[in-house]
Design a protein with these regions (language model features):
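Bacterial Sec-dependent N-terminal signal peptides
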Residues: 1-25
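Glycine/tyrosine- and acidic-biased, solvent-exposed loop/turn segments at the edges of beta-strands
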Residues: 17-154
């Protein structure tokens, strides 16, 4: 009997609760578990397309995004992967086309653009390269055409 109770307890400790958009109230950028907006939600959050395919998934801590935030195309392929810390952008933001190819890469630090930003064509050619430091333009910015010819350098 004790082994069954121990196994059940271990299973329940590992279980994670998930809510969907209709289960939460969004107010001023924070998700709550009730209409009185007194209890910020902590846990996994998901949204689905009308056909049941996963649209997005993220973890909320005290009602705000925390960690990895993934957005999907209706086909089920990943469209974007973002990183949050205490409800603000922090880390990489990757964007993919419907074929799964990386077409955008951006960096944030504590909610501000910080680091390299790159955009590629669907053919994989680099189109733009930009740099930011603490939200402000920095370094040399470049752009190329679809064939890889340099168009501008500032």
């Amino acid at each position: 009997m004790n082994k069954k109770l121990l196994l059940f307890s271990a299973f329940m400790a590992g279980a994670s609760w998930t809510v969907q958009a209709q289960d939460l109230v969004l107010s001023e950028g924070q998700y709550y578990t009730d209409a009185t907006q007194t209890t910020p939600y902590t846990g996994r959050y998901t949204e689905f397309y009308d056909d049941g395919m996963l649209k997005m998934e993220l973890y909320l801590k005290d009602g705000r995004p925390e960690g990895t935030y993934v957005i999907y195309y209706p086909s089920g392929k990943i469209a974007e992967v973002r990183s949050y810390y205490h409800g603000i952008f922090h880390g990489e933001w990757r964007t993919y086309n419907e074929n799964g190819q990386l077409i955008g890469l951006a960096s944030y630090k504590e909610g501000q653009k910080d680091g390299p930003w790159r955009i590629w064509s669907d053919k994989g050619n680099l189109l733009y390269e930009m740099f930011y430091t603490a939200g402000k333009k920095s370094g040399v910015w470049r752009s190329w055409d679809e064939e890889g010819n340099l168009l501008s350098e500032e």
